[in-house]
Each structure stands twice: as C-alpha cells, then as structure tokens.
From Swiss-Prot:
GO MF term set: 4 iron, 4 sulfur cluster binding; 4-hydroxy-3-methylbut-2-en-1-yl diphosphate synthase activity (ferredoxin); 4-hydroxy-3-methylbut-2-enyl-diphosphate synthase activity (flavodoxin); iron ion binding
Protein name: 4-hydroxy-3-methylbut-2-en-1-yl diphosphate synthase (flavodoxin)
Cofactor notes: Binds 1 [4Fe-4S] cluster.
Alphabetical list of InterPro entries matching this protein: Dihydropteroate_synth-like_sf, IspG_bac, IspG_bac-typ, NO2/SO3_Rdtase_4Fe4S_sf
Keywords, alphabetical: 4Fe-4S, Iron, Iron-sulfur, Isoprene biosynthesis, Metal-binding, Oxidoreductase
Pfam families named in the record: GcpE
Organism from which the protein derives: Bacillus licheniformis (strain ATCC 14580 / DSM 13 / JCM 2505 / CCUG 7422 / NBRC 12200 / NCIMB 9375 / NCTC 10341 / NRRL NRS-1264 / Gibson 46)
Taxonomy of the source species: Bacteria, Bacillati, Bacillota, Bacilli, Bacillales
Biological process according to GO: isopentenyl diphosphate biosynthetic process, methylerythritol 4-phosphate pathway; terpenoid biosynthetic process
C-alpha cells in the first residue's frame, strides 16, 4: 500500500495527553447524545465510546446545568473532553475552569472583544486549545451576502476571520473544522483551508444521515479528503448510536493505512463456490478483532481459487472448503483444520500475533527509556 503523506507543516496542538497535528496519527472523535447535565448517562456513553476506540469526545454545553456537570464528568472518564459552546462566553469560562481539555467556539458569535479575550485568557492559563467550527449552514450574514450562498471560499474566509480574532490576542493553540453536508463543498473547503493556514484540521461531513446512508456519504467525502493527506482528527456524524460513528471512523482510517493500532479484516464477497457459512464466520471474526490494538491483517476466504493469493496479503487467515479449512500465516499454509474448529483455531493464531506485537512494543518502549 502506498503511504499517504500528511501536511508536514501542520502546527502540533495538545489536547489533554494527545498531540493533534504535526506528524501524529489522525485522531478519532465522537460526540455524546445524552443531556450533559445527566452525569451518569453521559459518563456511561463516553466510556462506551472510549472502549470502542474513541480518542476524544465532545459534549454539548447549552446551559449552566451542563457547565456545572463538566468537573464530575471529567473526573470519571479516560479520554480528553471537548466542550461545545455557542454564544454564552460565561459557559466557556465555566467549562474551562471545570477541566475541559478543549473548547469549541466561534469567536465571532461569543460577543464583544472583551468577552472573547476573557475566554482566550482562560484557555491560555489552562493551556487548552480552541476549535473554530466553521459550518456551511451557519456562515455569517456578510459572507452569504458577498458570495450569494455557502461556498468553499466563503468558508475559508470565515475561518480566517475567526483565526485572526484569536491571533490578535496572541492565541495560537487552534484547531479548525470546515463542515458541510454537501460532500463536494466539504472537499473543496478542506483543500482550500489546507493551503490557507497551518492549523490542524478536524474533518467531518455534517448532517450526513442514518447509519447506512451516513456511512456511505462520510466515507466518500472524508475518504477523498484523507487521500490528499489532509486531516488531523475526524468525526463520522451519524443519526445512530455514537459507538457506530467510532466503528466507521476506525474502518475508514484502516482503509487508508492510517490506523497503526487496529486489526483489519479481509473477507471475500461469496459466490457459488462457497461451501462454508462464510458470512457468519466473517462477522464473528470481525467482532473478535474489534478490540485488538495491533496492526494485524486477517483474511476469511471462502475457497481455494483466490484464497492462497489473497491470504498472502494477510498476516493470518483461513480459506474454507467442504468440511475443512486451510490456515495461512504470511501466505504460507500452517495446517488444515476441521470446519467445526476453524474459527477457534484462527482466533488462537490472531491472539499469538497480537501478543507478539505487544511484546515488541513493550521492548521498544523499554529501550527508549534506558
């Protein structure tokens, strides 16, 4: 697989223990669907997201009750917390004081300069970044009057306007998003933004739709953007359980070789040659490898026609036949296994590969520390 090159001059920005931008990997984000003031429900959902592979989570902060909940939520989660603020600068101040790792605002809708300055000074004091969220659906009136309708140039102009507000206050820990529901508009906006400034870009196709339609739309748009080396964090926005957003994001990054800590499944589309229940097997294996944090490529193939060649591209795999399967490792046949134990044997081999990877990681880490 050819390697995707990221913008090399992207400014690195810290979000909690993570660094966004620079030469770092693309980070997966999601957003809670709970009422933020409901601490129990919000924490439970965030922990489910983290278990699924979410690395940064955003919560809405529409009122004082939500802002008051931030300290308790922050205490009980393991991933960085982003707080989403609109209009009320006092909520931003309270969220920052409560332990937010990042806030998302549009400086232009916070109010007078002194209000923006208060938020910026609080963020500076705590050492947290600000995400400027540009959205095609809520561009400033003056920009819509200038361009007639939402355009990529208008979105970039909006971003630069908000960036300048922060830069004029000597604030540079900035992340920018350029979201649109229209895929072509989003692609163009991100391409132009990548050339206009060096701040990290958070990717997203907003209002993309339901689980099925939204997955296709997001993969089409964000895949095109990622293929150009653009993007430092991303969220798949779906009208679904947010855990599904994380699953789709992981698969998308794996497709481009941009996830070094995730296992990947290759499985054939099935045909009349298939003599095993390949679909059930593939689903079971996919579920099994979902939580493995190692770059293992696993193949589940249905016959001997394409099996050996395709298994050569995988670290471990099985090619099924009537009553038995061939277990492959790095393209070499390891052994024949009965159909009834085929999946369990494959899982054992997956575990061995994962343990080898973890041991290698630990050795490298120890070497760096000595």
């Amino acid at each position: 697989m050819s390697e995707i090159t990221h913008r090399t001059k992207t400014r690195p920005v810290k979000v909690g223990p993570l660094t966004i931008g620079g030469n770092n990997e693309v980070v997966i984000q999601s957003m809670t669907t709970t009422k933020t003031h409901d601490v129990e429900a919000t924490v439970a959902e965030i922990n489910r997201l983290a278990e699924a592979g979410c690395q940064i989570v955003r919560v809405a902060c529409p009122d004082e009750r939500a802002a008051d909940a931030i300290p308790e939520i922050k205490k009980r989660i393991s991933i960085p917390l982003v707080v989403d603020i609109h209009f009320n600068y006092k909520l931003a101040l309270k969220a920052i004081e409560g332990g937010a790792d990042k806030i998302r605002i549009n400086p232009g809708n916070i109010g007078r300069r002194e209000k923006v300055e208060a938020v910026v000074n609080a963020a500076k004091e705590k050492g947290i970044p600000i995400r400027i969220g540009v959205n095609a659906g809520s561009l400033e009136k003056r920009i819509l009057e200038k361009y007639g309708y939402p355009t990529a140039d208008g979105m970039v102009e909006s971003a630069l306007h908000h960036i300048k507000i922060l830069e004029d206050l000597d604030f540079h820990d900035i992340i920018v998003s350029m979201k649109a529901s229209d895929v072509n508009l989003a692609i163009e906006a991100y391409e132009k933004a990548a050339k206009a400034f060096d701040y990290p870009l958070h990717l997203g196709i907003t209002e993309s739709g339901t689980l099925f339609a939204g997955t296709v739309k997001s993969a089409a748009g964000l895949g095109a953007i990622l293929s150009k080396g653009i993007g430092n964090t991303l969220r798949i926005s779906l009208s679904a359980d947010p855990v599904e957003e994380v699953k789709v994001a992981r698969e998308l990054l794996k497709s481009f070789g941009l996830a070094s800590n995730a296992a990947t499944l290759i499985s054939c589309p099935t045909c009349g040659r298939i003599e095993i229940d390949l679909i059930s097997i593939a689903n079971e294996v996919e579920d099994y490898i979902a939580k493995i944090k190692a770059p293992i490529k696993v193949a589940v193939l249905g016959c001997a026609v394409n099996g050996p060649g395709e298994a050569r591209e995988a670290d471990i795999g099985i090619a099924g036949a009537r009553g038995e399967g061939l277990l492959f490792r790095k393209g070499e046949i390891v052994r024949k296994v009965p159909e009834e134990t085929m999946v369990e044997e494959l899982k054992k081999e997956i575990d061995k590969l994962a343990e080898e990877h973890y041991a290698k990681q630990a050795a490298e880490k120890e070497k760096l520390n000595t």
